């Protein structure tokens, strides 16, 4: 984010104040950029494992993603709490309504909803059992519900970092959890259009494009996706 680049000013004004930089998800290139932007070249770097062995990853391509997601939920999580991520607000609303019609408690969450509605839906998700929250990426920051048993993506995430961060909201209690995703060509075209229409400079757009291509590569992989996911963050699967 552009604002982060201005943080170096604090060090220039207060050079004797100790600093620490923390991030939950960053590949090597991003870590190098953080170090450079914050002028932390002499700092020590500590990296914990990215592996979440209790999460099972599944990625599905094909028609009728909504029906395939419903089959996944019914077969694996008929009474469990979960998160369904969608790319657009319209898709969030439609998916929450559809899941409700199927008999599940499904609540929408996106930035276009009134704040009181977002807070109410968030609190119900945190306090009640078996609630499914259907959301854009506006949902999740600071949310800590240990017993989320599944995270489903009905839209392709924009990067592996985003995918890892969003799926990482499942199974925080250490118990088995599922990360399920459906994707299609339209998702790729939509995300590319978003990137092309953004106000970012061309260098940033190239980085975002490369991240999307890496995400697409993970989807199309026929080998172990956990191994590829860890490899993206420069970690070998033991």
State where each predicted segment sits.
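Cys/His-rich short segments
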Residues: 211, 216, 220-238
